[in-house]
């Protein structure tokens, strides 16, 4: 294994371990706060915690066993590194992450009486489920057209979330608006990145494949391929294009998932008087 790839993998493993520790501390903190949370509030935060677990542990697994899906490339010669395992874990984790945002938006919408927010909260997970199916299509067939649709849906979902938060803005208390503004700014930046860089990249790859007459796999052929074939590579040149997004995805995105468990906008059920009986 080249030195660069080793230290990158070591970084991913260390971050994955720290993320599990952070989630465990978060779970303990929520348990200690149960006495000052109303039943509805505690149930909502506990569900956030469970959904976060799906994302945190899923990303930790993928940190230890990184896989480059389209190229069927991995670091270790093990069936655990097969694309079908890695993509299955990723699908579950990403649905959990989407559900966290949907749950958060649902709670904010209930607290502020926003119908727009409630509708958006209901459609977010189904939209991401469709995006995951498009991802599977691309991974199995090796056609980048599925990734074009997948990334477009992710961007659309983020855009709907930002729109809903902006709609809710006038109804939120002044103390929560800085956090709301930060989420909106991050969401707008994400949408811009997806539509200006990510989606065009996959679109250009698909056009190049079409121009070269690339032969795509069928769904059945793809299933057999991702189940039984993986290519072990420790070369920096092979992994260099995956390092940046994987490093951010398995660190910053996971921290955000853990933070959502204790988001201040969910605190409408907190009491400062006597503990709940």
Each model region followed by its residue ranges:
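Non-cytosolic membrane-interface motifs at loop->transmembrane helix junctions
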Residues: 72-86, 143-154
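C-terminal transmembrane-bundle signature of multipass membrane proteins
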Residues: 16-26, 162-277
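Membrane-interfacial loop-to-transmembrane alpha-helix junctions, especially the N-terminal start
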Residues: 38-54, 113-125, 175-184
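Internal transmembrane alpha-helix with an interfacial aromatic "cap," most often the third helix
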Residues: 23-33, 63-70, 87-121, 129-139, ...
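Hydrophobic transmembrane alpha-helical segments in integral membrane proteins
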Residues: 1-22
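C-terminal ends of transmembrane alpha-helices
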Residues: 56-72, 128-146, 192-205, 221, ...
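Short aromatic-rich membrane-water interface segments that cap or initiate transmembrane helices
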Residues: 2-5, 77-92, 234-244
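Extracellular-loop-to-transmembrane junctions of the mid-late helices
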Residues: 140-170, 174
């Amino acid at each position: 294994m080249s030195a660069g790839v080793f230290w990158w993998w070591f970084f991913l493993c260390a971050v994955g371990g720290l993320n599990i520790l952070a989630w465990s501390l978060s779970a303990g903190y929520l348990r200690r706060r149960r006495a000052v949370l109303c039943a509805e509030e505690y149930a909502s935060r506990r569900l956030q915690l469970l959904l976060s677990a799906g994302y945190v542990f899923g990303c930790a697994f993928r940190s230890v066993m990184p896989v480059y899906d389209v190229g069927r490339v991995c670091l270790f010669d093990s069936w655990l590194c097969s694309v079908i395992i890695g993509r299955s874990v990723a699908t579950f984790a990403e649905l959990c992450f989407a559900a966290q945002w949907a749950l958060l938006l649902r709670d904010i919408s209930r607290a502020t009486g926003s119908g727009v927010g409630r509708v958006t909260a209901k459609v977010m997970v189904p939209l991401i489920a469709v995006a995951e199916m498009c991802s599977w299509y691309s991974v199995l067939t090796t056609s980048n057209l599925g990734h074009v649709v997948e990334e477009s849906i992710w961007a659309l979902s983020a855009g709907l979330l930002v729109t809903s938060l902006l709609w809710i803005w006038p109804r939120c208390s002044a103390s929560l608006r800085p956090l709301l503004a930060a989420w909106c700014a991050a969401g707008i930046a994400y949408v811009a990145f997806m539509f200006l860089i990510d989606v065009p990249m996959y679109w250009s790859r698909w056009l190049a494949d079409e121009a070269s007459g690339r032969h795509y796999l069928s769904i059945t052929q793809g299933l057999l391929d991702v189940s039984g074939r993986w290519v072990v590579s420790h070369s920096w040149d092979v992994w260099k294009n995956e390092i940046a997004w994987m490093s951010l995805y398995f660190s910053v995105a996971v921290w955000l998932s853990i933070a959502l468990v204790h988001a201040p906008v969910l605190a409408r059920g907190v009491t400062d008087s006597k503990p709940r009986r």
